[in-house]
Structures are given as structure tokens and as C-alpha cells.
């Protein structure tokens, strides 16, 4: 059988060289012949939120920042949680940070202090529309579609390995433009462009950045028109304009929807199992993925040990076929941070299942869906930080 050149990944190239597909493992063959995604065209726009209060529902690592409303963050349109440090974009386009100065995440605002309990403005930023946390770096998307970063210099500089491991001043990520949003992540950055393409940089051991091998900024090849992009720890998962879900990277946790598990690929493959559902948004956590369809149903797959199934079980198994999460009302948004899945319904109520809110002082005893108490409707969640809707 002749295999198109664009289908051949580094892993499969090795086994093909050793003797054709019969020399490949069953997992490699399964990924090699997985269904391709349908061609589509998309023109996603930047997510917009009303200026509201940022509210902390979990603990900030190594910080004395109390849970509840973050002082000075009552006009916020985007938030990001890097574990030790929080960042927010204000309605006027400025950015401020609070927490611990790990890897320069306070952007030089702490004046040598190890942490701050009051937000401090990040210098040199006046036109931000959103912020994301990728490992120990913050990446902001500007109104003109460019991206700047600070913190861990490997991510903040676009996958370049410089002389200093830390960047304390925001600077442009070269080669990145026309971006509408950047996905939260850990080892790699994934940025959604206004033409439905995806840019990536960072660690590429699982081929999450596609071809060629390397760590620097590139447009990931053969991605159909994407409307939503997420990082599920070693695999990228997208929703396309046709309502399909596609994924690439590592399949050890079944995130590519292929059996037997294992293998990896740098080409997007279609994740089947959604029936007639039209998926409009995706989210990625620690080795699991979520998909929201147009009817408000949430689907999940991947490693199940954290209770992502929402049925009360926490068996350490892997689900490669998406399954609806029971016990939830129709949702309008889904998100995931580390081992915690989240959802927001039409009234703004925040739902969580699995192990519960990130870094909560009281981990959930029951992994079934439950409402998270909040002083007002939620617009979005990142880590342990909720952006509330404006009050009446």
C-alpha cells in the first residue's frame, strides 16, 4: 500500500524504513491509517468578555493571596493562572499581575520582592485583549493579532533557547501574527489564527508542533479550519468549522481516538464517536479532553483517573471514544485546568466535576458534577481564577 508522504511521521518513517507497515507496531499502524479530517475553512474571532471581577476559588502556590475577589481586578476582560502567579487584562488593554515572582512572572514589578499581594501593572502593554498561561510564561494577544510573552524565556521567546532562562520584560514573539487566542498549556504554545490555522512552538517530543522537528514558531501543517484549539498534555485537540474534532500528537492516553493506544502523529486525525453532534468548542486538561456540542452536551475522553467521566468513578483507565458527561445542564462553555474540568451554563452557573476546582483546600469527595458557589455569574475560568460577569 502506498502511503502519502505527508502522512509519514518520524516514528512511522523509522518502522517503514525497517520493513514497511508490517514492521510498525499495531499502535503505529492504527495512527498511520486513522481517518483524516475533512477540509474546511474557518474565520474565528477573538473571544470577548464584559469587564468584570476576577474571583479566586483555589489557592495560589506559595502565595498568601486569599481566596475571593482579587483586589483591583474589577474591570477585567481576560485572566490567566500560572500556578504561582495570576495575570489579568483590564478593559483598557493594560495587564497586571499578582502572586509569586517565579521565573520572572511578575515582569519586574515586584522591585526585588518575592511576591506581591496587590496587583502590579506590567510595563509597556496597553493594547492587550487576552492573556494565557503556558507553563511558567504568560502570553498576551494584542489587538493587532501579535503575541508578546514573559516569564520562562523558552516559551516567551517562541521556542528559542537564549542565554537567560527568564524574560522579565514583555517582548514580541517573532513570527506570530493574526492570532485571535492562545491556549493555556504546559510545555508547548498553541495559537489560533483568524484564518483557522494553528501556530505552535515549545517542546515537540510528541510531534504536537507538527513538522519540521524543532521547537521554534511554525504553522502546523494540514490543520483544517479550526474554530477552537486546546492542549491536552502531549496532544493538540481542535474543533473545526464542520463540527468535527481533530487531534494530533501522542495517543498513549487515547486522545487521538484511535485503538490500540500508543503511537503518535504530526498530522491531524479525526476523532470519531460523537454521532451526529456538532462540536463547537474543545478544552484540554492533564491527559484528557472535553468537547462541547451545539446542544450544550459535554463529551470527554482520555485518562479517567481524576473522575472526568462525571459518573462517580475514578478508575485509572483510558477512554479513546468520547462519552457524554451525565448530570450536567446544557452548557455554553467548557474548560479544563490540570485535572479539573469546568463548565458554565446559560445562566452563568459554574459547574465542576472530577477532583474539583484546581488547588481547592477541600478536594471533592464525589466526582459527579456539582455547582461551584460564586457571588455572581461566571464568564470564563482559568486554573483557580474565575472571571465574573459585571453586576447589575
Where are these regions (language model features)?
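Eukaryote-biased RCC1-like beta-propeller repeat architecture
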Residues: 4-12, 17-392
Amino acid at each position: 500500500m502506498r502511503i502519502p508522504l505527508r502522512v509519514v511521521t518520524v516514528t512511522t518513517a523509522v518502522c517503514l524504513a525497517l520493513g514497511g507497515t508490517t514492521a510498525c507496531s499495531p499502535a503505529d499502524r492504527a495512527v498511520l491509517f486513522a481517518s483524516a479530517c475533512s477540509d474546511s475553512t474557518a474565520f474565528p474571532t477573538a473571544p470577548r468578555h464584559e469587564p468584570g471581577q476576577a474571583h479566586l476559588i483555589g489557592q495560589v502556590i506559595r502565595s498568601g493571596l486569599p481566596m475571593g475577589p482579587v483586589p483591583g481586578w474589577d474591570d477585567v476582560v481576560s485572566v490567566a493562572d500560572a500556578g504561582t502567579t495570576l495575570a489579568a487584562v483590564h478593559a483598557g488593554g493594560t495587564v497586571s499581575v499578582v502572586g509569586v515572582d517565579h521565573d520572572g512572572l511578575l515582569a519586574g514589578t515586584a522591585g526585588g520582592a518575592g511576591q506581591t499581594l496587590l496587583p502590579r501593572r506590567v510595563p509597556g502593554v496597553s493594547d492587550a485583549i487576552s492573556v494565557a498561561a503556558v507553563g511558567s510564561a504568560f502570553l498576551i494577544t494584542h489587538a493587532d493579532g501579535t503575541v508578546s510573552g514573559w516569564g520562562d524565556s523558552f516559551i516567551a521567546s517562541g521556542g528559542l533557547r537564549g542565554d537567560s532562562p527568564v524574560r522579565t520584560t514583555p517582548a514580541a514573539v517573532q513570527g506570530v501574527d493574526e492570532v485571535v487566542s492562545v491556549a493555556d498549556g504546559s510545555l508547548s504554545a498553541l495559537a489560533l489564527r483568524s484564518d483557522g490555522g494553528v501556530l505552535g512552538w515549545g517542546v515537540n517530543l510528541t510531534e504536537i508542533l507538527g513538522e519540521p522537528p524543532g521547537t521554534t514558531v511554525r504553522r502546523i501543517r494540514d490543520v483544517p479550519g479550526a474554530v477552537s484549539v486546546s492542549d491536552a498534555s502531549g496532544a493538540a485537540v481542535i474543533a473545526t468549522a464542520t463540527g468535527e474534532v481533530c487531534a494530533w500528537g501522542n495517543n498513549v492516553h487515547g486522545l487521538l481516538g484511535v485503538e490500540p493506544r500508543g503511537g503518535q502523529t504530526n498530522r491531524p486525525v479525526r476523532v470519531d464517536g460523537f454521532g451526529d453532534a456538532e462540536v463547537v468548542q474543545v478544552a484540554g486538561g492533564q491527559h484528557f479532553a472535553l468537547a462541547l456540542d451545539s446542544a450544550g452536551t459535554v463529551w470527554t475522553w482520555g485518562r479517567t483517573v481524576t473522575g472526568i467521566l462525571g459518573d462517580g468513578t475514578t478508575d485509572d483507565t483510558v477512554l479513546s471514544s468520547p462519552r457524554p458527561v451525565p448530570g450536567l445542564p446544557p452548557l455554553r462553555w467548557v474548560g479544563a485546568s490540570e485535572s479539573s474540568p469546568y463548565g458554565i451554563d446559560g445562566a452563568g452557573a459554574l459547574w465542576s466535576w472530577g477532583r474539583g476546582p484546581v488547588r481547592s483546600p477541600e478536594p471533592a469527595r464525589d466526582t459527579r458534577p456539582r455547582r461551584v458557589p460564586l457571588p455572581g455569574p461566571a464568564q470564563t475560568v482559568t486554573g483557580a481564577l474565575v472571571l465574573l460577569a459585571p453586576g447589575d
